[in-house]
Amino acid sequence: MKLHNVLKNNNNNKEDVGPSIEQFGGNAEWFNTTKVLSECLPYIQQFSGETFVIKYGGAAMTDRKLAESFAHDIVLLKQLGINPIVVHGGGNKINSFLEKINKKSTFINGLRVTDAETLEVVEMVLCGLVNKDITQLINKAGGNAIGLCGKDANLIEAKKVCYTYKENQSNNVEKILDMGFVGEPHEVNTDLLFFIEESDFIPVIAPVCSGENNITYNVNADLVAGALANALAAAKLIILTNVSGVTDANGNLLSEISVSDAENLIEQGVANSGMIPKLQTCIKVVKEGYGSAHIIDGRIPHVLLLELFTVHGTGTMVLGNDI
């Protein structure tokens, strides 16, 4: 039934109580939609003109419907006046190609040990296959995405990472493990990113960077996203994962945690494997930056919009120690 007919019928009644949900065929979804839209308004007003750095990875990349949902969300953010910068991983694709050449991977604290042969595969997969697929999806959704890697225009300069560990806890002697061509962000060319934002493009960045003597490094995408968020004074860093968020020792989701809480989760071994660089990145962004950091479940369709524009949100937000 059309809205004007509903109102007309109501005017013929002795007691005008207004149109009811039943008069719309009992479809409460219409009303819920308008409620959600009105709920978005204060967040849109708050973040218009701000920069969001979004680390994209996990199931949101491997599931095509989730990938298309993510692309639409990125375009919507841009249309709302927010400047999204996408940094992507691609671990599953890298693993798949390494398996084809019978190459095994070793991970230490969530970082892939990278020799010369592995580096070639990483650069080929991330900068070629994965990066271009993401830009194509965003462009198909109506955006203007441009694919980059850390090497382009010296966007991100990296330095070599060395992992220290104690072989024997009794003698307290630390040893250095060579991670190969694994780097960490050192400097960011913010001028290029500001230029891209002003040109109405959406940058999509692969975490392959160069360092001293033009050596190429494989850099963890979480660390790259964090470095960009700090360098650009981004309002938010958002990391998509394959889990619901950060959990405590009992597996309960933590909707908000302080920097101290995050540090304790790492020290106590509650956070492990790939969650370690994610939390470390969030800690650094909150300590050194101006915004908040979020770890959210990329398996949920339109999870970005749920986290950013609804009262309850989803996942885990990392805030300063004064929460």
From Swiss-Prot:
The record marks K55, K278 as: Transition state stabilizer. It is found in: Cytoplasm. Its EC number is 2.7.2.8. It is an enzyme of class 2 (transferase). Substrate binds at G90, G91, R112, N218. GO terms for biological process: arginine biosynthetic process via ornithine; L-arginine biosynthetic process. It comes from the Bacteria. InterPro entries: AceGlu_kinase-like_sf, AcgluKinase_fam, ArgB, Asp/Glu/Uridylate_kinase, NAGK-C. NCBIfam families: argB (TIGR00761). Catalyzes the ATP-dependent phosphorylation of N-acetyl-L-glutamate. Belongs to the acetylglutamate kinase family. ArgB subfamily. This is Acetylglutamate kinase. It comes from Ehrlichia canis (strain Jake).
